[in-house]
């Protein structure tokens, strides 16, 4: 799972595939609270020694704590990435266009075909369509081709010591140690992004503990090497964040003429991460119809009474349902969620 953080009023999407500063997108599912680094922080060696003591106090075995933490040195590249300003800004439309290339869509469709039987079993268990699972897999790690090369314990210890979001990364480090204690992977093989997002789904360690599953039945929740575990874990995460089986995520719509002023009277949400607060309060489809909202082709909206929120992202408007918010739970940025959902639609041939 990608990790986002606030920088200069915008939001940085950080995952194994790199960084992009997305204007108008929101914080991630695990928003990292900013803090102020202490000028009198201990040396890295002293800090890690205290982490080791605290980890053992939390029930982590001495063997795991020693294997993961002994002789660690800070990763300067991690500190630089954490502090860096992105060098370019992408709009939502640019973000989507740069990722949803014809070649990438074909690759995603091929992956869905290759794993069709597995994805059907996963959908039967978790209610999440295989097209959506493959879309997340593709955007997070290019279908498992690149899931990060940074040693996760070292990266998290560095970020915890660096201090600006120290408590968050300290807790993630303890979660990583719990994973090592579980025996899912060795310390040397626990690799991920500079921010500690791990494996092919790019889960933070705490998300691994909450959502990773052993779908191949080998006794380990292996999101690094086991394709069944990877894809099922993505589905389980989305299910746990509210994905409703058989429902769609939303649709592009047309808001033109008098409808522009009419919809402006609908208030925005007042709770949730930034991306959620950029959604309108929900209204029934027939209410949006009366306000002048139409399908992207200019036709009447469906007559269903389900509720939807209006979203203006880039140059387009969308009516989005609860399932869209489940995708925001993976990474709370509209550029990300719209890329995922539109890729899933293209995989399904819509």
Across the structure, where does each feature detected by a protein language model lie?
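Acidic helix-start/capping segments at beta-turn-to-alpha-helix junctions
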Residues: 65-89, 137-141, 151-153, 252-261
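Solvent-exposed loop/turn segments at secondary-structure junctions
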Residues: 73-74, 140-144, 197, 255, ...
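Bacterial N-terminal signal peptides that target proteins for export
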Residues: 1-15
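C-terminal soluble interaction/assembly domains
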Residues: 259-350
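Acidic/His-rich structured neighborhood in mature extracellular/periplasmic domains
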Residues: 92-233, 239, 249
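Bacterial N-terminal signal peptides
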Residues: 13-24
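Ligand-binding pocket segment of bilobal, Venus flytrap-like solute-binding proteins
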Residues: 220-280
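An acidic, Gly/Ser/Thr/Pro-rich helix-cap/linker signature
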Residues: 31-123
């Amino acid at each position: 799972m990608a990790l986002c953080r606030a920088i200069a009023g915008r939001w940085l999407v950080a995952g194994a595939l790199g960084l992009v500063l997305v204007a108008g997108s929101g914080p991630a599912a695990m928003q990292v609270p900013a803090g102020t680094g202490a000028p009198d922080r201990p040396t890295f060696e002293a800090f890690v020694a205290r982490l080791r003591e605290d980890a053992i106090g939390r029930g982590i075995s001495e063997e795991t704590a020693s294997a993961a933490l002994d002789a660690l040195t800070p990763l300067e590249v991690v500190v630089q990435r954490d502090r860096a300003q992105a060098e370019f800004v992408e709009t939502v439309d640019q973000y989507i266009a740069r990722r949803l290339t014809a070649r990438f869509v074909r690759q995603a469709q091929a992956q869905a075909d290759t794993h069709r039987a597995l994805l059907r079993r996963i959908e039967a268990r978790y209610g999440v369509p295989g097209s959506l699972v493959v879309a997340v897999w593709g955007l997070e790690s290019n279908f498992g081709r690149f899931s990060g090369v940074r040693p996760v314990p070292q990266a998290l210890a560095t970020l915890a010591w660096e201090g600006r979001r120290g408590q968050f990364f300290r807790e993630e480090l303890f979660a990583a140690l719990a994973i090592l204690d579980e025996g899912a992977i060795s310390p040397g093989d626990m690799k991920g992004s500079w921010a500690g997002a791990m494996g092919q789904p790019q889960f933070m360690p705490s998300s691994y503990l909450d959502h990773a599953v052993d779908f191949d039945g080998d006794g380990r929740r292996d999101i690094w090497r086991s394709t069944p575990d990877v894809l099922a874990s993505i589905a389980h995460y989305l299910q746990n964040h509210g994905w409703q089986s058989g429902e769609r995520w939303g649709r592009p719509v047309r808001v033109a003429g008098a409808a522009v002023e009419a919809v402006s009277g609908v208030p925005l949400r007042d709770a949730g991460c930034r991306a959620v607060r950029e959604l309108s309060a929900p209204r029934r489809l027939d209410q949006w119809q009366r306000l002048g909202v139409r399908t992207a082709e200019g036709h009447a909206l469906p007559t269903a009474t389900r509720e939807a929120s209006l979203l203006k992202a880039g140059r387009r408007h969308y009516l989005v349902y609860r399932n869209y918010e489940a995708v925001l739970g993976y990474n709370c940025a509209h550029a990300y969620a719209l890329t995922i959902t539109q890729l899933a639609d293209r995989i399904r041939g819509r």
